[in-house]
Amino acid sequence: VGEHVPPLRLRDRNLTFSADGSVWCNYLLTGINVNSYQPDTATAAQDSHELLYAALSQIPTDDIMITGFKYRKNPLDTMNAITGGIPDWDPVRYRYLGSLLDDLYRRMCSGKEFVEFDRLYWIAISQPTSRRMTERLVSTVVDVDPLEGMDWADLEEFEKHCFNSLPIEFRPRRATPEFVDWAFERATTRGLSIPMLPPLVDPDDPNTPRFKPTEKAYPEVMFDEAAEATALYSTYLTDLENGRKYTQNLSKVDRKRSLFKRFRTLAGGKIMSISHPSKRTASLPDGPVSYQSLFGIARYPARFDEAVSKFTYIVDQAIDADADFTLRVRFSQDLVETRSVSNTEKDLVSEGTANASDEFEAHEYDTKRAELRRFHTAIRDESGPIGMQMAAIFAFGSDDLDHLQSRVSALQMKFRKNGYTPLLPVGGQKDLWTMMMPGSRRTKLGDDLLQTSTAHWFSGAMPLRRSFAGDPVGMPIAINKENALGQIILLDILNATNQGNASMAFTGAQGRGKSHALKLIFLFVTALNRYASVVDHSPHGEWAVFALQVARTQVVNAATGFTYAGYRSMDPLKCLPSPEAEIVMQAHYLPLFEIDSKTSEAAYFAKILNADFRKVRGITSTRRLMEWLATAGEPEARLLLFNFEHWAALPYSRAFIDPPRRSHDDDGYPPFDNIAELAQRMEDGTTPHATVFRTNGLPVYRGKNPKGATDQNKWAAAVYGSIARMTAFRFSQIRGTCVFFADEISFLKGNEDVVELLIRSPDRIGRKDGNFLAAGSQHADDYDENYAMIEKKGALGQKTRENAIAALSHIDMPVLDSLIDMIINQTSPPDPDNPKIVRAGRHGEGWWNDGTITVRCQYFPILSAVLARFADTTTSRMIRESDLDEHGSLRSAAAGRHAANAEAA
């Protein structure tokens, strides 16, 4: 039967009673979120830590344990967070999204992909006890009840005081007995597996099942405090068996004793092992073995400043080892009194005089005295210093002894480079391990590791910290790479505008994943049965190709009127009701005709566009309006007709102006969509729908002199304005979230209609209607003052220094040479064997700013291999619109470049 280490006598709610008579109050805390790229958040986190230390210093205790335990997040919790942002979640209603999430859940449960971890901060506070040392020693050999004479009322009062002292910023919760079991499992399997947390229940809830946990039913484990010696002895036995030369002349007795004669210190190890015999197999007779190495910090950097220290945060980095940490803390004002500092200096002088044998050893003592004087100066300059001592312990685990040895050596070197002196006590591994466990006292070794500081200065270490980005609920869009915990970043699409501006802007060089990130969000918008509108001006129709696979998508060529259902019209008189139709017509044509809005021609145009005027004359389209103008005799009519005929004759105006009628009952092209019907479909919420406007035949004017624009440039500007007005009207008719996607937004520059309707207006008032913009650009400078209110921003890899600087500024990150190098050379780097493609496994790397926190991340892949194929824009693998048949489906595989496309189909 297994027993807890250290032995426990009783667990009651969040109280732990150890066999040595100590009583502990246990709490679970959440780390303070820190933005590594914004000093203000680090300062706030330091202030919170100083507040925590100040609160703990008021608790009458001499022993506090703060441990950071790593745990694996339950995939089901992540799934609940994803669906938690959907008010009417129903797997039937959202069948397509459900299939994507089912696949994601299977991949998460496999443990190979999308595995999330986090860190639980455990704080245990010892209640002061009056038991003498002799009583505690007796309790270890004689069965003495440690609870005899316990003042339960005093204990309850102490526990309340402890809980109420913890600052709310850390979201304190009372631990339960199940968490002690979990902590034991975590500590004994470090490096083997990372267990999920038990459910946290309220022990005072009457519905909570009541039980008294036994302290004799822990999993049985075996400790080997000299794991390296065991491994070395195994190698020695193998050499004996193989008849290695150095073993051939040994007698039978010497064969047994030779190893330990050669290496006399092997009984005390630097690495210990914890085996699980209850899980033994034929290949693992001792069961799975966790190799662990622990060290403390014997000396801290010889500086006192407020710089952010990563210190304990190293356990969350990509160190290629499983790791936890513990701080054993005590507080005393005696530590910062001048008398105490003076006595310490006298001791150093005496030790130096007695022990220094030469000038170099004497110099070491002089250095320590200089550090002491700097410390005294620092606390004198601090207002109301709170003295504290802390012993820092780090534990690293692996299932491979050799690997652990190499990693611990590298980590020790890393600590030394940062000014810390690690102490790896030979023979003291289990002592350190035990001090990391709930219910354990600080030992003599722990006392030796205590280092003196103040609450203010040690707050710079920020041991209780985290880097969490994204929304509490929503769709998965990225993996947090700020550390190695792998948090899945969520984006709340349906409720995005509740907290204000919801628009987002991405920037990244071609081939670095910008369009991929936008398509991922588009996929989720449509899978949520919401409406999306896209302007696709790519020459190969990359958005049309992708959208046709994920939603009931309508693709209309804004120049020719081509759709996969036949030619359609974007004529405002056909597509919009009154008065929207009149507004769009005037905004579209008056600038083209170079007619001022205050002229008689403009007034005449407004009169004939009136719905009542058109109704009695059968004017249902722009072509019929032109026919009526041909019969009118007013000079204004002749001028309007002249201009209409000019533009109607151009090949790129067909989508807005029907060809001449072939017969009296020829109504021309039907409207590309019935907007009223669309609104009703979206109200039903059952059919995702998207519109893609193909505008590749409509180039915008890039020059600064408006007179240099060609007719095609002028018509393109008018078309973009009409698309913006139609889209804005659609959004206004649909209840719920609508999203406008604009990739490579440089085409919008200078078009005030589009900028106002689809960028500035949603930023100001779109949140009231749930609408927002998702934009992308290769160069961040395209995001001018019109995008100033956008808070959510993404940045992916860049290829030039100029673009890298603009991208860093865009995402509110400091422009540092190290970050410039990272965004150019270390973000989705090219494959070393083929520089034209991104290195395997490095696609979509970049940063995400959720409006509050910025983190380095890797954007999610498209959650379907087939869909990912249609989203791929790599030149050699890209599916072009020309590869689709007349129904929008992929053509049969043909020889040559697209022969592999049959697999995508």
Label for each model-derived stretch:
Residues 352-353, 487, 493-512, 517-522, ...:
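Conserved P-loop NTPase motor cores
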Residues 110-111, 577-623, 782-905:
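P-loop NTPase motor core of the ASCE superfamily
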Residues 1-445:
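Extended, folded cores of ATP/NTP-driven motor/assembly subunits in large transport
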Residues 198-214, 220-221, 231, 240-244, ...:
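Phosphate-binding P-loop/Walker A region and its immediate neighborhood
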Residues 43-58, 433-488, 537, 570-764, ...:
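P-loop NTPase motor domains
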Residues 33, 68-98, 109-112, 516-615:
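Switch/coupling segment of Walker-type NTPase motor domains
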Residues 2-20, 259-268, 274-278, 287, ...:
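The Walker A/P-loop phosphate-binding site
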Residues 67, 172-182, 325-330, 419-431, ...:
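A generic structural motif
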